[in-house]
Amino acid sequence: MSKVKLGDVAEEVKETYDGKGNPAIVGLEHLVPGDIRLKSWSTDTDNTFTKAFHKGQVLFGRRRAYLKKAAVAPVDGICSGDITVISAKQDKILPELLPFVIQNDDFFDYAVGKSAGSLSPRVKWSHLKEYEFNLPGMDQQRQLANLLWHFVDAKEAYEDLIHQTDELVKSQFTGNVTGGAA
């Protein structure tokens, strides 16, 4: 395991949208605090976004970093200028592991500490790239990424089960109340 800086293993992507196609459109409102997967976006083309991103890249909400908004993109699209697009240097870090480096309390604490501005603090890539963390070799990265994504899948399945149970209870309660009133 070796200590590395984020900028040694990942880079900020500054790609401009070419205007072709019907991209997914991501604003800060689509990044859910604590969620590592981007699950919603817009297709409304009435916006001024020009920053392009691609499937597998990490979208980091650089404005108000204390909100802990960062997620891996499941599709290609365009995003707000208040989102930093981060891509793994694949010979240094597995793209599947990078989202977990970004979506963690230590990284967010670092980002908040480097943010500037009072009403709407923002953090720059020039500061984020200096974030240091321990990184294992590629074989261990593969094992770790696999394990972490299994945890994410299990957590999401559990949350879905809770939601379905809530809906079932609501439907039973509604049925009993309306059925009993007739």
Language-model features and meaning:
Residues 1-17, 130-146, 150-182:
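Non-catalytic DNA-recognition/assembly elements of restriction-modification systems
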